[in-house]
Amino acid sequence: MSQFNNVTLVKAANVYFDGKVSSRTVQFNDGSHKTLGLMLPGEYEFGTQAKELMEIMSGELQIMLPESHTWQSIVGPQSFEARESPDNCFYFQFSRHAWCYLI
């Protein structure tokens, strides 16, 4: 999907890691939503409260998911699924700016 039509964009940003990771919520007419984010180069650790599909629109990163012990290379456009894991984290290492959205 190259664009979202007929949506509401919540102005308030979710800001993490001293401003190096930020996101905005995109609300659709049917009540669903997505999160559109920007991640600057760096290393980050995230937990998930629900299953998430992450679509990397551009950029290059390495990820390590909780059920894995190896790094996986992701180059946008590409997606991956992060299962619910409140007690475990997944890790990112970015070498270039990344645009992504969560479904």
From Swiss-Prot:
Its EC number is 2.4.2.1, 2.4.2.2. It is an enzyme of class 2 (transferase). One of its GO terms (cellular component) is cytosol. It comes from the Bacteria. It catalyses: a purine D-ribonucleoside + phosphate = a purine nucleobase + alpha-D-ribose 1-phosphate; adenosine + phosphate = alpha-D-ribose 1-phosphate + adenine; cytidine + phosphate = cytosine + alpha-D-ribose 1-phosphate; guanosine + phosphate = alpha-D-ribose 1-phosphate + guanine. Keywords: Glycosyltransferase, Transferase. The keyword Transferase applies. InterPro entries: Ppnp, RmlC-like_jellyroll, RmlC_Cupin_sf. One of its GO terms (molecular function) is guanosine phosphorylase activity. Belongs to the nucleoside phosphorylase PpnP family. Catalyzes the phosphorolysis of diverse nucleosides, yielding D-ribose 1-phosphate and the respective free bases. Can use uridine, adenosine, guanosine, cytidine, thymidine, inosine and xanthosine as substrates. Also catalyzes the reverse reactions. PANTHER family: PYRIMIDINE/PURINE NUCLEOSIDE PHOSPHORYLASE (PTHR36540), PYRIMIDINE_PURINE NUCLEOSIDE PHOSPHORYLASE (PTHR36540:SF1). This is Pyrimidine/purine nucleoside phosphorylase. It comes from Shewanella denitrificans (strain OS217 / ATCC BAA-1090 / DSM 15013). The gene is ppnP.
